[in-house]
């Protein structure tokens, strides 16, 4: 049970990091081009 919860949390964190990276990249792309 505990391992599954940790896996879920880490998966959510990875999703958030990827989302933020994409948003930042798009923001910079729009501002520079």
Curated annotation (Swiss-Prot):
Keywords associated with the record: Cell inner membrane, Cell membrane, Membrane, Stress response, Transmembrane, Transmembrane helix
Cytoplasmic side: 1-12
Record localization: Cell inner membrane
Listed InterPro entries: YkgR-like (IPR048190)
GO CC entries: plasma membrane
Transmembrane regions: 13-33
Membrane topology term: Single-pass membrane protein
UniProt protein name: Uncharacterized membrane protein YkgR
């Amino acid at each position: 049970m505990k391992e599954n919860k940790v896996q879920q949390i880490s998966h959510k964190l990875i999703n958030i990091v990827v989302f933020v990276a994409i948003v930042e990249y798009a923001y910079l792309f729009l501002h520079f081009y």
